[in-house]
Amino acid sequence: ENIVIVSSGKHPDLGALKRALVSNEQVQVTIVSPEEAMTHQATADLLVLYQPNRRFAPLLDIILDQKRNMWLISGPETDWSFLNQKQSIFSKETIGVTDEIAPEAIEEFDLFTSQWTRWADLPPLRTDIGAIAVSGPHQDLLKASIQGNILDQPIMSFYEDTERRWVLLDGVGFWTWRLEAHRLEGSYESIDAFIGSTAKYLSVDRANERLIVDHQPIYQRAIGAQIMAQYFDVSYQL
């Protein structure tokens, strides 16, 4: 699996995301600029756009035209005016104020089983404050909380229609989540597995069958038939 992380600047999140993703030995991760991404996108199974701005315009055009899956990570350096003009799935009206937002888990989330569950124990992320809207079918995994006040808007949202899947993580500072997860559990395994499940959700072939039935096509009347079935979640995990 080939994942390309696209960023116009440096941030400790980039290395933390790469380390989390390559904990799966079947995953290869490349970190590139928006301009470099134009030569990498064709062979990418997943594109991760980190704090996109207008330099991402040609790449975003390809994603939109080809209805590609995408993971969007936004924060204080994200140009939401640009994003709001280019697409309408995720929109945000910022007010020019940056603050810390803490994650609050939403129990109804059922797209896949998150290996990490201790969301309340993680440090806050940083982002520009503003109302987020998701247009179309989606599920939110995390809601935002500011100074103990839970807001009716997501930190992490999963959008899916018949042609594509997008994920939004609104907030930077994943590197602090990964460090705290290790401090709490003595291992990166659970938090890395969650990042891996998110990437898998975005990179699976939607033509795959989620219900696999194993049976013999023809049975003799006197012989009992045995049918075995396996059901996979949307990340194609048992």
Question: Predicted regions: what is each one?
Answer:
Residues 214-220:
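Short beta-strand segments of immunoglobulin-like
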Residues 207-214:
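Proline-enriched interdomain boundary motifs that mark the N-terminal boundary
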Residues 7-11:
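Short, surface-exposed ligand-recognition loops at beta-strand->loop->(often short) alpha-helix junctions
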Residues 147-149, 234-238:
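Detector for glycine-centered tight turns/loop "hinges" at secondary-structure junctions
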Residues 4-6, 167:
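Conserved beta-strand elements of the Class I
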